[in-house]
Amino acid sequence: MSLVIGLDTGGTYTDAALLDVDRGVVLATGKALTTRDDLSVGLGGAIAKVLANFDGKPNDIKMVSLSTTLATNAVVEGVGGRVGLFLIGFDEAALERADLARALGQDPVYFINGGHRPDGGIQAPLDIAALDAAAHKLKSEVSAFAVAGHFATRNPLHETKTRDLLREITGLPITCSHELSSSLGGPRRALTAVLNARLINLLERLITATQNIMSQQGLTCPLMVVKGDGSLLQADFALSRPVETVLSGPAASLSGAAFLAGAKSALIADIGGTTTDIAFLHNGTPRLKKDGAFVGGWQTMVEAAEIRTYGLGGDSEVMPILRGRTGGLTLGPRRATPLSLLALRWPTLKDLLSRQLNLAVPMATDARFVFPIMPDGAPQWLTRSEIRLAKKTIAAGPTPVAELAATQLALGAVDRLISRGLLGLSSFTPTDAAHVTGAFTEFDDEAAMLGAKLMARQRNGAGIAIAATPLDLAEMTLDELHRRSALASVDAALAHEGGGEAAVSNNPLLAQSFRKTPASNDQLVSVGVKLNTDLIALGASAATHYPPIADAMGVVLTVPDHADVAGAVGAAAGSVCQRVMISITQPAETKFRIHLADGPIDKSSLDDALATARIAAKQLAEARAKSAGATKIDLHLEEDIKLVPLSSNKDLFIEALIYATAKGRAT
């Protein structure tokens, strides 16, 4: 009997499941609220509930496996630490590619002379003096560094030299782009490195909290972390590559869906607090997206399961549309703590809501609060105005946005603190709406109702309240969530089949078919959309929200037992898998260059180069699998040799790609 505890830390809940992996049986489950300012509280609560229903001893547990949506949520919401980016051998035009400038925002970037040519040769000497000056300037202004060099996948020398110098001067975490991907495309590698650097502190907090709870509970087994492709990494290894845990939660949920429902082919929709993750199972497994996961509008270079993540969940921020004469609501993509949930921790929130309701004139910031998520106090790299706001919320607890943001300048500072993950936002959400309708009642009904009243009296451009009653407002909110969820599912299905992104959402006639209010009788044409596959819905609120969504798409719905902890189940059922790619190019007639992780080497024939690359790929994949925690490793090689036939019965060699995959058990 091989016993494994799976954990899944989401934005709202932390779930745990105890599995007998050999028998394929769920023995116990537990659920606790995620405590973002101290993750160990939620983790400890979930693990304690599982162990309370377990007759054995803690040392009977062979492994703890952790999946999380926190990295995915951070990317979707634009939350994370301040990063310094070093672009080596690039000019400023690189920022306009791969949306790199938008990803950086206000974070600093330095352009350093250096980099390499496509054949791995040096393009220009590395400017050590410029690096040294920038490192000393930034060491107290950022939380981590990202380094991307021109053609670093063909020769990583300048990236590694930069990393070593930054580490010596600053001691801060550093991400090199060549360590995350062996593919070409410098700006996209830089984007992936920036996201990775931004997530390091977040994942470190989560892993440290988990290890502390394991120690308290007497669990001495290894801790593993789920990657975005559903495979596992040892926790210490994962700390150097946190961006690989983007889509960790959704990937674990896919594994959990296959385990719980026994499904071979289906659409899987996992609704959480922040996001809805949609994927398709074929023969019991998801398709891998080798060119990189698309998350929150960013095309990364992280190999992951083909999962589409939408900023749409039970805790999506609800915003009234105040311009124009029609009014209405928008949802997400930012997550907000539901008012009904925040009131459990701070009951005084209801007094603040009542005070706003007693004002004669509604304000756009009504029912919107911020609260501190700074266990170590305000970071010193904040601006003076940001530090002042941070200290005020630490002292006061939940604070109306209107009190902090009397000007646009102050509102910008509040938004920056939220985006850095230092302040939490609380506002009306679909979870609150479900409390008002009675569909969900676990939190504080009174706080939800007060929020609904404040939202309903907001006025559109014609001066008319956007909803007649709080119940109408709640139903509008849930209708919008269901409509957007159905649209996302159909969009994902068409994109999966090569039809492009948002094909239905961008078509007014097709999008209209998902509105609860039917098209006008004056409309000459009406259409409907139907999915030709079954739907498996996962998540704590799946049973609440997905029946009307399934009806809108005309599909058969399954919400399996333990659907609310599917991510934890999938985390426990995972195995270790590491993939490596080595490329071969031909810079001269009799020179075949093998681009290895520690620099290129040359061979005089293609056969010799292929033989060397095969051995190197297998050795590197096996070494990484062992570092990731695998035993009993199986190796598999694939090759893509690109040749162009010539008229002289000869082939012109273009490139060879050698792929090695190492798989093994984690226990």
Segments predicted by a language model, with ranges:
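N-terminally biased helix-coil "hinge/interface" segments that flank
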Residues: M1-T667
